[in-house]
Amino acid sequence: MTKPLELPVIIFISYLVLLAAGIQEGRYVKHEASYDQPISDKIINKIIETGDGDVFHCIDINLQPALSHPLLKGHIIQMEPTSYPSELKIKSSSDTIATEAHLPTIACPKGTIPLLQNSKADLKTQFSFDPIGNTHHRGGERAGCTTYDEIYGTQVAINVYEPKVRGQNDLSASWALMVNGPTGNYEGIGAGSIVWPNYHGDNFARFHIYWQVNTVNMPCFDHMCPGFVQVSKSVGIGGRIEPVSTYNGDQYEITVTISKDPKTGNWWLAYGRDKKPLGYWPPSIFTYMNEKASACFWGGQVHGPTVQLHLPELGSGHWAATGPGKAAYVRSIKVINKDSQYFIPGTHNTFSGSTRPFCYDAGDIRFNDDGARLLYGGPGNCTK
């Protein structure tokens, strides 16, 4: 089915804050107090540089940005999910032979997490767009599919490309987003691959996480503002995804899983086919996303202050009609119900579409036992 997409997303960059506090050993780590402080050499346990030049600071798990959130005072860090949704295996698609892409492994010591040193980004630059309906007049476009339901998580395999982005602070994303809330006041969480030149001074596909809460109306990425509690000591959020797909050539994908812990209520994020837990968004920071989502989007989005002057490529930079291996895809799409079970989105409440059909498109949704899938993309650089 197709209809205009109505998924809300508001994007702009915030600032980086950190806190200091105590730590205790065990599965849960309790944070007793918090106060904002600038990052300093004193809280860096180890510095690690990857082969492609990224620099990660290993900091104590209790000195991460999330715990400076005023609603997380006294928060006890949950080191792993209490349980996992059933039917986690993603099957191979008959018309897509894709290899799993990876993030660099960061060998931070036990009890620490890696934070990407982001000295090249202009963190003061901000941009946003209208979260409802057609968004081109506010600097955003999208193509993909959306389902509307009571949603407690999702799992998707995302085809990874490096689309050309012309504006330095514009971005092109391929990701999954979950939202809830009244019109004009949505909250959301998500993750996926983004090419964003101004983020780290390059045009690489990088793994980013996103969330927005209505109390501050301030969308955030990665660790730029408090909210996401990271537990992984080896996965660097914001790191480069490699390899990436080539048009009519080798195809690579990442698997993103977001699931609500049935006991703690935390929104857990896992990366890869082995579903490695990265961390979680505590429900206490949300008003509308504290219990469930009402809609979920999978596909591509472009945003930025100069998007309408120089529309970036989306996906592979080619139309969905070019077919598998040429257009980008999202596949094995599943959602999670209240009983922590996977199910395939319904044909009656799942729709594909584009906010700018002369620039980007989304193909028909295919439903099978593996989940839903579709192709999407476009060259951008159009005026209609």
Region annotations inferred by a language model:
Residues T2-K384:
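Exposed, interaction-prone regions of secreted/extracellular proteins
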